[in-house]
Amino acid sequence: MIQKKICMVGVFGTGKTSLVQQFVHSLFTDKYHSTVGVKIDRKQVDLGGTTVNLVLWDLAGREETEEIPTSYFRGSAGIFYVIDGTRRETFDQLFEIRESVQGTIGDVPSLVALNKKDLVDEWRLGQGDYNALLDKGIHTIGTSAKSGEGVEDAFLWIANATVNK
């Protein structure tokens, strides 16, 4: 069996933990609990006959002035960035975070989840923002940890990308 470590990265409160809980346990809670350090979950997925054990490292949300400990990224096969579509600043900080991560581990498969898609009335991102991601070659998937929309697609995409790298 293949094992792949995926790090969940983003600003605090974007829904990293909620996405992992929805994917691994089919659970969602409205209660916010800040992750301290790192929380590790596992889930096996079948990719067309290849079984992959995903080891999901849910890293504590980054504050504006904080750096993520580089040791957390050691052995990572992929990075799953999460931004909150209702909080513009999480999009604005993505590029800085991504640059820092790439400087630490190099160019590994990555994905940006545009999370909280269920809150469309509160969305603060537009087509120009989406195009900015595409222009940089960043793969994006809209997700909702609450409804589950796009969650499995996002995790299966990053799993496939790490296996086929």
Which residues fall in each region the model found?
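TRAFAC-class small GTPase G-domain
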Residues: M1-K165
